[in-house]
Amino acid sequence: MDDLETLDFRELERELANALAADQKYSRENDAKFRAIHQKVASYEEFRDIVLASNLKPLERKDKVGGESKQPWNPSFNTTNCTQKSEDVMLKKSLSDPTNAFEFARDWRRLGNVEKYDFLLQLGAEKLSQLFHAEVCSGLLGEFLLVLSESFQAIHVEKVLKILQTLAETKRFDLNLIFISRSEVESSQKLFGKLQTCVGAMKDEKRGLGDENLRKLMACYKISC
């Protein structure tokens, strides 16, 4: 009984630490965004670099610059097959249900584009709304549009529309939309082109509602008809 209580306490402590880290990361990135805007950066890439740099840990006196490192460039290179299998199992478990934006971003970075598409559909609009109740940063927003465009399947049209609607309702959406890259803008245009085709092929009773929702979404995402 004592061991169980200790284990529960440690799990609670871990979740609290993760939530605190996520809040701190959000605060740093948010400050960096406004700093970049005030600096009037010349490009999206420069804006993104400033936001990403907000999470870098500064060097300390004991850190050596240019010195020989004893740690290999790829620490996981020598892991055994058994360890790799164990990590794969842990990854699948962790992908099942992230509890906050920090855990989502951690899992997201481990996936390929097709897996990312499946991950978004698996979570669905309601779960994404819970994870990103604060905002979806421009980096993730652009990646979402890119992934949805590249892997889109007609059978998922309603799920994708709901996901896009959820993203459009997040805080500072208009600001984050401004800073997505040119390639991500093009992907967004292609995605909505595919959605238009799918909605146009719907039966009459669904097409009217689908057309109306799609027009509103296109206006939100600054897509011209």
UniProtKB/Swiss-Prot annotation:
Biological process annotations from GO: axonemal dynein complex assembly
Domain of life of the organism encoding this protein: Eukaryota
Cellular localization per UniProt: Cytoplasm; Cell projection, Cilium, Flagellum
Pfam families membership: Dynein_attach_N, RPAP3_C
Coiled coil: 8-32
Keywords associated with the record: Cell projection, Cilium, Cilium biogenesis/degradation, Coiled coil, Cytoplasm, Flagellum
Listed GO CC annotations: motile cilium; outer dynein arm
Subunit annotation: Homodimer.
Task performed by this protein: Dynein-attachment factor required for cilia motility.
Family as reported in the entry's similarity comment: Belongs to the DNAAF19/PR46b family.
Name of the featured protein: Dynein axonemal assembly factor 19
Source organism phylogeny: Eukaryota, Metazoa, Chordata, Craniata, Vertebrata
Gene that encodes the chain: dnaaf19
